[in-house]
Amino acid sequence: MKKSLVAVGVIVALGAIWTGASWYTGKKIEQHIDQSVAHANAELEKAFPETGLVLQSKDFHRGVFSSDVRLVLTVKEGIKNAEIKPGDGIEIKSVIDHGPFPLAQIKKFVLIPSMASVHSKLENNEALKPLFEVTKGKSLFTADSRVSYSGSVISDVDIIPVDFAKDGVKFNFSGAKLTSDLSRELKDISLTIKSDQLTINKNDENFVVKGVDLDLSNKKGKFDIYVGDQNIKIQEIILKGISNQDIVLSGLKMGSNISEDETNLKGKITYSLDGFKLKNIDFGSGTFAITADRLDGEAVRKFTQAYNDASVKSLTSDYRSPDAVNAEIIDAVFSNLPILLKNNPQFGIEPLTWKNTKGESTINYKVNLKDLPKDKNNLSSMKTEEAIRTLIQDMSLNVTLPKPMILEFATQASLVNGLDKNRAEENAEQQVEQLEQLGKLFKITTVDNNAISIKFNYADGNIEMNGEKMSLPKFLSEYGLSESSDDDEVPEQTMPEDDTHSSGNIQAEGNVQSAQ
């Protein structure tokens, strides 16, 4: 009997502790929601200043073991031409189970102590009425989130399948799974999204996207800019009957990486395509990478802030036209662009490639810029040579176009345009021969190992063009790039007339002098 009383006492004590902890947690949750909304609004204004979006929490009702709240996404007052009408908003209804052991988690046998477990879904209101008609009265998504005592939020979101037809258009979406992990104050963000298929049909036109996979892992760096990795993979994109073309893109990948050191930011954006078919003709695969290095972190922060400020200012414009607003934003961008040249940034295309069954073409480009001089008033009046010496530290361009590869590409392009195989091959041979001869005529390209190539390097006022070294003034003169005052020094060149005969040879009439 005594042991039973002790057991009952322990249970009552635990229940009292749980009740007290849940009640206390409920009070902490209300504070946490207010802080989270404030942080979310700060990030919305930084990332999407032109939208005027703002998040609000309304109707918070706190109980002992659970609470209710509505989150409303709306727009600021005074915003013109907003997507959301004044007074309307996208409402999310949330039911919050208090910690330390939220009932919703206990039901799933998740016994990790947490501040709260939150179940959220969209509310059917006037703003979302069209969406709920499409989803047949169901919330487009439901979200289950776990809020830790450190303030981080881990969420699992289910986006439901959607299937509807209207005005001859059929829309089918398989649904999606989203997982996110957000730290306190959104300093660290990770996100994954997976979806199987989206199909849109209209008459004989079809658009299909298969196998979407997004993975993001970012953290806020020392310059208040997110650094980290983002990757998107799409298994296949199919377009049939659109503009009488059938297009298939396979293995589409897009990735970006931003990193930082004590003073600079460094970034790389890559695109790749495993396969491209047009009218069932396989054109091959390609890659494209853009790089940036030595971008002064503080300068990038100021540049971004200037753009955001201009965008926010344009939102409340009552009297200016959209063109005037856009012009003001563009002016803000270009007026602050010079600050990005601090620390001699480097930009590049490393590489751009395209590969088919006959070979692979590559383009590599890199430029190192100089910081602008203190007196910027003379920049607009600078002659070409002075501008190059002032702005560019060094630059390189390397192009390799294997002749069999570009011949195959040109043949396929002619086949797509309706030519038969023999005529397509003849036409392609003419095009490649003309490209080669024009490149030689104007000393732009050479032929090396059966590939048309360009090798250009510039540094400190000296240039090497396809193996020939020369000074910057000589290069500008020979290639017709000098100022008008120097035109008398440039040998006159007459462009050859195009020869459309089957021989593919180029006939040069009159005096044609190649630059020497």
Stretch-by-stretch model annotation:
Residues 1-5:
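Positively charged n-region of N-terminal signal peptides that target proteins for export
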Residues 8-9, 16-516:
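Glycine-rich, small/hydroxylated-residue low-complexity segments
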